[in-house]
């Protein structure tokens, strides 16, 4: 008969404790409304264009307590140009399936925003200007989960549009 030493017993207890604690997942302490934070943009300036001539990648982080982000059918990432607040651009966050017992999720989202036209004081746009060599804007961003909860709204750094 093989006698189990104290150190072997401790190893087995530690292993059992590790397996049990790994099997028990706690739901993260995130609220059910999505929360987003601005991480950055790949460019601080772009050349004006009305046909997607230039772009920048915007990165945000997110948390969502019930993990119901993304939708197959709706546009749920809203990006608003600070110069034209009534006309937001809408994007689709890919569907994230709800899995496991701790349904809270966190991660990062990156999306391309294409160049836009310079808007001049007289309201004209999209032509080169020596009088107004640059225009600037920032984006306001928010997301919505499948339950209809809106996130907080975040602001990007300023982006300079080169009016060439």
Predicted regions and their residues:
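Bacterial signal peptide processing site
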Residues: 25-28
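First exposed extracellular module after export/assembly in secreted or surface-exposed proteins
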Residues: 2, 33-164
């Amino acid at each position: 008969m093989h006698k189990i030493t104290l150190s072997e017993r401790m190893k087995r207890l530690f292993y059992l404790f590790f397996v049990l604690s790994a099997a028990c997942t706690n739901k993260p302490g995130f609220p059910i409304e999505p929360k987003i934070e601005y991480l950055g943009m790949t460019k601080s300036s772009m050349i004006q264009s009305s046909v997607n001539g230039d772009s920048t990648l915007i990165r945000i982080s997110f948390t969502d307590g019930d993990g119901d982000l993304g939708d197959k059918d709706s546009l749920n990432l809203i990006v608003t140009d600070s110069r034209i607040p009534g006309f937001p651009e809408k994007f689709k966050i890919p569907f994230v399936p709800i899995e496991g017992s701790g349904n809270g999720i966190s991660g990062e989202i990156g999306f391309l925003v294409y160049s836009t036209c310079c808007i001049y004081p007289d309201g004209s746009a999209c032509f080169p200007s020596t009088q107004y060599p640059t225009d600037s804007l920032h984006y306001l961003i928010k997301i919505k989960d499948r339950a209809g909860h809106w996130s907080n709204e975040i602001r990007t750094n300023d982006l300079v549009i080169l009016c060439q």
